[in-house]
């Protein structure tokens, strides 16, 4: 599990630069509720030139030992007998200071929760990339980048959770004198959001705030320390509960 989250978020595909397209995708964890089949994801461009963005999707398959593999899906253009997540459109042209959206559509089996990595990758458009621009526009864009000295293309990776059709939450709490544990006995991920571990008498003496996803049949726990307080928000789908524990 821990390795999965290290790949989430901002990643650099080349060197370092300030000019050119600079995309953002908002939150890096998205959740599709059991009664929904589509989700709109917006891509923002805060840069100085147009961003040509490819949307790539892999399914995350977990093994019994907790390790996982990322499996490529079928061709985005084919929806025949599809089982997985697709982006429409899978190619975005986002103007400077503008925003464009792609619709993430799930088709297939929802008896259990499924997980996908969605990558938003800015590229220098080539003919095979299937962006709706002319050959001359492609060449003009390349020339513009060279003249501006742009050497970086920065993209984002997000994790997309597809909840089961019949979503059921069942979080079991085990709170004893020395240890606190949450165990997920439901069939969909629950979230421990903004987990804070702070000194009881010093409000600003806190360890780094963290976020944890508790998968089905997994648990999250921590040892209580005297003189410390633990605060977080437990999120089960649309339900949120603030929890405070004293060490």
Where does each model-flagged region fall?
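Positively charged n-region of N-terminal signal peptides that target proteins for export
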Residues: 1-4
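Bacterial N-terminal signal peptides
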Residues: 7-15
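Beta-sheet-dominated interaction scaffolds and their linkers
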Residues: 20-49, 166-175
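Asparagine-centered strand-capping/turn motif at beta-strand->loop junctions
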Residues: 43-49, 106, 180-188
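Short acidic, flexible loop segments centered on an aromatic residue
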Residues: 51-79, 121, 187-202
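Terminal connector regions
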Residues: 58-60, 107-167, 230-247
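Intrinsically disordered, low-complexity Pro/Gly/Ser/Thr-rich segments with frequent PxxP/GP/PP motifs
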Residues: 73-109, 203-229
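Intrinsically disordered, low-complexity segments enriched in serine, threonine, and glycine
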Residues: 174-247
């Amino acid at each position: 599990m821990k390795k999965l989250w290290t790949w989430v978020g901002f990643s650099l595909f080349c060197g370092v630069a300030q000019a050119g397209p600079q995309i953002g995708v908002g939150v890096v964890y998205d959740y599709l509720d059991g009664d929904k089949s589509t989700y709109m994801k917006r891509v923002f461009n805060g840069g100085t030139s147009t961003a040509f963005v490819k949307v790539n999707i892999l399914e995350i398959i977990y093994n019994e030992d907790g390790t996982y593999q990322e499996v490529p899906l079928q061709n985005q253009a084919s929806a025949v007998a599809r089982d997985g997540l697709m982006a429409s459109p899978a190619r975005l042209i986002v103007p400077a200071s503008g925003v464009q959206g792609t619709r993430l559509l799930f088709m297939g089996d929802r008896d259990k929760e499924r997980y996908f990595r969605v990558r938003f990758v800015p590229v220098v458009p080539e003919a095979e990339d299937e962006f709706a621009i002319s050959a001359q526009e492609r060449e003009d864009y390349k020339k513009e980048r060279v003249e501006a000295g742009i050497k970086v293309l920065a993209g984002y990776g997000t994790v997309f959770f597809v909840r089961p059709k019949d979503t059921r939450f069942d979080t079991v709490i085990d709170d004893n004198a020395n240890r606190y544990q949450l165990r997920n006995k439901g069939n969909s991920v629950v979230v421990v959001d903004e987990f804070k571990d702070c000194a009881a008498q010093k409000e600003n003496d806190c360890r780094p705030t963290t976020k944890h996803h508790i998968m089905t049949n997994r648990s999250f726990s921590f040892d209580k320390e005297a003189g410390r307080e633990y605060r977080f928000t437990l999120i089960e789908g649309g339900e949120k509960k603030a929890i405070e524990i004293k060490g």
